[in-house]
Amino acid sequence: MFTWKRVRYGVMFGFLAYISWVGYQHQTLGGGPEGIPTVDSLCPLGGLESIYGYLTSGAWLRRVAPSSLILFIAVAGITLLVGRVFCGWICPLGSIGEFCNLAARKLGIRRRELPPALDRALKMVKYAVLAVILYFTWTWGTLAWRSYDPWVSWMHLASGWEEMVASPWGYVVLFFVVIGAGLFIERCWCRYLCPLGAALGILQKFSLTKVRRTKETCISCSKCDRSCAMGITPMALEEVTDADCIAGGRRT
């Protein structure tokens, strides 16, 4: 039976498998003309981080390539057109967190939801994280966030224990927040801490496409509320304008 949920899971798994293979290949073959692109050249956040330096001095941050800026512009453009589909359909960290939560529920671990007031407060943290990252990156002229970035850690898993010992904090975030906390609170990283999600959440407010509830056919079953990976309650709204909406389509 065709459902958008199955299509989405297929797309998520495909992108996660591909980008994980790219990370493995980079660790085994190395970079350079004969190798595989670096982790940083494939990260849209790096494009946002490098904008200030490029505009003021014409130079890229170390490790960042023009591809990062191209990716960020593309993702930002898609967000303005159809919402945060990058977060809901493509982002590897989002997929890891969501798949881990699905596995946890299959094993009988109950999904948890924080009290609404606490949830709203914590959702503001990612904007502070974004502001801090941009401030120190633009001030220092280097990728200040890199040592704490779970995306970098995921792409370096093939490097083994030596990499984990040399740069442990990113792995702490990966294993304890993206995966660990994500077992109980679905997409915990995405909801509360992701800096790229914060940037795209701002753009989401201006998106031309919004998720809408059709009152004439809605039977008030609350399925959309229960299935939303980001803890939004679409049934209480006619049009979902929440910055955290990732167009997951799990209600269908």
Regions found by a protein language model. Name each.
Residues 1-238, 243-244:
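Non-ligating segments of multi-cofactor redox enzymes
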